[in-house]
C-alpha cells in the first residue's frame, strides 16, 4: 500500500538512517517516466494521441512530446490533461512525475484551472475563464 506524503515527511523527520528509510519506502517514490505515465493514461482513458492533440488545443506539438522529441512545459502538460479528460488528481500526479509544481489553489490562475478540471470544462472554456480574468491562457 502506498504511503501518503505526510507519512513520508514524518518518517523522514524521524528516520535515524536515510538508507534504511529509502529502502523501506522504495515503492512509495515516484519512479515512472512521464512518457510511460502518459501512455498508461491514454490506455486507461481509451484516447489516441490524435484526440489528445485536438482536445488539448496544442495540435501537432503533442506528437513531439509523446515521441520524446520535445520536453513539455508545465502549461503544456496541463493542456494535455484537458485533452485526455484527466481528473484533478491525475493532473497533479502528472505534474509531480514531470517534476513540475502542482496546481496550487492559493494561486488565482491555478485556482481557475483547478475549477475547470473539477467541473469537466474543456481547455477552451478554461482559457475563456482565464482570459476574462486577464490571466495568461493555456493555449
Where are the regions a protein language model picked out?
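Recognition helix of helix-turn-helix/homeodomain-like DNA-binding domains
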Residues: 56-72, 97-99
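Short alpha-helical "recognition helix" segments of helix-turn-helix
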Residues: 48-55
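A short, Lys/Arg-rich alpha-helix, primarily the initiator
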Residues: 14-48, 126-138
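The alpha-helix within a helix-turn-helix
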Residues: 42, 53, 81
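Short C-terminal boundary/hinge segments that cap the last helix of small helical domains
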Residues: 86-100
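Short, basic-rich loop-to-helix N-cap that marks the start of a DNA-contacting helix
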Residues: 69-81
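Helix-turn-helix/homeodomain-like alpha-helical modules used for DNA recognition
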Residues: 98-139
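Helix N-cap / loop-to-helix initiation motif
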Residues: 48, 73, 85-90, 122
Amino acid at each position: 500500500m502506498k504511503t501518503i506524503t505526510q507519512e513520508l515527511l514524518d518518517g523522514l523527520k524521524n528516520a535515524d538512517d536515510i538508507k534504511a528509510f529509502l529502502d523501506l519506502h522504495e515503492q512509495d517514490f515516484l519512479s515512472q517516466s512521464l512518457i510511460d505515465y502518459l501512455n498508461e493514461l491514454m490506455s486507461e482513458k481509451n484516447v489516441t494521441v490524435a484526440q489528445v492533440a485536438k482536445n488539448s488545443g496544442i495540435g501537432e506539438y503533442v506528437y513531439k512530446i509523446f515521441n520524446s522529441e520535445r520536453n513539455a512545459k508545465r502549461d503544456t502538460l496541463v493542456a494535455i490533461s484537458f485533452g485526455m479528460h484527466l481528473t484533478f488528481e491525475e493532473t497533479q500526479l502528472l505534474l509531480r512525475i514531470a517534476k513540475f509544481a502542482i496546481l496550487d489553489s492559493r494561486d488565482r490562475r491555478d485556482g481557475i484551472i483547478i475549477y475547470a478540471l473539477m467541473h469537466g470544462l474543456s481547455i477552451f472554456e478554461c482559457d475563456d475563464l482565464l482570459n476574462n480574468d486577464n490571466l495568461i491562457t493555456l493555449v
